[in-house]
Structure formats: structure tokens, C-alpha cells
Amino acid sequence: MTDGGQSAELRSFSGLLVLVGAGKMGGALLQGWLRLGLDPKNVAVLEPQPAPEISALAQRGLKLNPDPKSLAGVTAVVIAVKPQIAAQAVPALALLVAPSTVVVSIMAGRTLKFLATALDRPCALIRAMPNTPAAIGRGITVAVPRNASAAQRALADRLLAATGAVE
């Protein structure tokens, strides 16, 4: 279990994190990561209708809607899209995924099996379900791993802890 406090600090994260979908929950995660010290230069956001505060982060180095082909060495992908667009969105992410990549999904109603089939690549998968208070940093998220090492699970927990406790 990880709490939303200092144990989840992200200042030391030096990889590339791709957030797919920056609506209510994805945006809450992003704001939490930045609050915990994540450098915007380490983040790419794929969001067709970004909120003004997310667009403004591009001034601080956040990569907003880059060509996914230009993103090399992705450490983690967090999928926060609506489930109804998952069948289109998730397979397109396969080019970002390597065996060392951690893929975290907070999509409602989409299983680990769906993710594995849609990505069709070996990678660490984490299926997570945050509750509504996560949108204000006071949530509890249940996370279930598949093919994830202890270090990959720890990274996923650190990312998810930006909005509250993780089980």
C-alpha cells in the first residue's frame, strides 16, 4: 500500500511518462504528479481537447500531442481514456510499448486481457480503478499487476498515489 504523501515523491523520475487522456481523472493524475515534483519535461500528454491549464504546461516543457512515433524510450504509459474509445486508442499505443514499459490503465470496464490483446506486445500491465475522490487527491485506488516486476509495480504505485492511497 502506498499513501499519497512523501513516499510517492516523483522528483527523481527521469524517464518518459505518456498520459493518454487528460480529462477529469487523467488531469487529476497529471496535477498530482506535478505537485509531487515530476518535471513536465518528462511528460507527454495525448489529449485531443486539452484544458487550458494543460496547454499552459507546454511552456514548461510538457510535450502536448506529439507524434507518438517521436516518443522513444517510454518508461510508462497511463491510459485514462473513456472505455468507448479504447478499441481505437489502445492498439495505437503499441508503438510506444517495449518489454520494459509499464502500462497503467484506469479505464472503467476494460480488463487486463483486453489490454494485453489490444497492445499485442509484451509489457508490464497494471489495471487500476481509482474512486471518485481521487479527482481531488483523496481517493483510494486498487491496482492489479500482470507481468510486472516489483520495480514496475512500485513505479505504478508511485504514479497512482498522486491521487490518494493505493492498494
Question: PLM ranges: what are they?
Answer:
Residues T2-P68, R138, A165:
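NAD(P)+-binding Rossmann beta1-loop-alpha1 motif at the extreme N-terminus of oxidoreductases
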Residues V18, A108, S149:
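Short, conserved glycine- and acidic-residue-centered signature motifs
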Residues A22, A92-L93, A151:
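Structured catalytic cores of enzymes that bind and process phosphorylated ligands/cofactors
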Residues K24, P50, R110-T111, T132, ...:
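Short, glycine/serine-rich, charged loops/turns that create anion-binding
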Residues L29, S55, R60, L64, ...:
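Rossmann-like NAD(P)(H) cofactor-binding subdomain of soluble oxidoreductases
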